[in-house]
Regions:
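Short strand-connecting beta-turns/loops that link adjacent beta-strands
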Residues: 22, 47, 91-92
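Short strand-coil-strand connectors
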Residues: 24, 62-66
Length: 117
């Protein structure tokens, strides 16, 4: 049995990779909002922090009532309890990756966990 899982994804507005890659400790989704669209709900989490990377486009996030502008290349970490909602700009859509992991669960960073050779 291989020590990896590979998948190919199509063009969808939201793709969750936990099932496609058999993820055990992370949720990763690829998301695309067309111009003028938004995530239709405000949400927070019980234990999981979220890391967002803006792959293309422009928009904004409202986090605990604060409006944050987003554009290609921006990265954002949001604590579990923060209430959040995402919006594409009226002119262009926004494509982003969301990585969700349990807050404070990482015990070792790459250099400490790597086995060379």
């Amino acid at each position: 049995m291989a020590n990896y899982t590979k998948t190919t994804i199509g063009k969808e507005n939201r793709i969750e990779l936990h099932e496609k890659l058999s993820l055990t400790d992370a949720e990763i989704s690829l998301n695309e909002l067309p111009a003028g669209a938004n995530v239709p709900f405000v949400h927070s989490h019980k234990e999981n922090e979220e890391i967002y990377g803006i792959l293309s486009g422009n928009g904004k996030a409202i986090i605990d009532g604060e409006e944050i502008s987003l554009s290609t290349g921006d990265w954002l970490k949001i604590a579990p309890a923060a209430k959040r909602q995402f919006f594409a700009s009226d002119i262009s859509g926004i494509t982003y990756i969301c990585i969700q992991v349990k807050e404070n669960s990482l015990e070792h960073f790459t250099a400490e966990d790597a086995v060379i050779g």
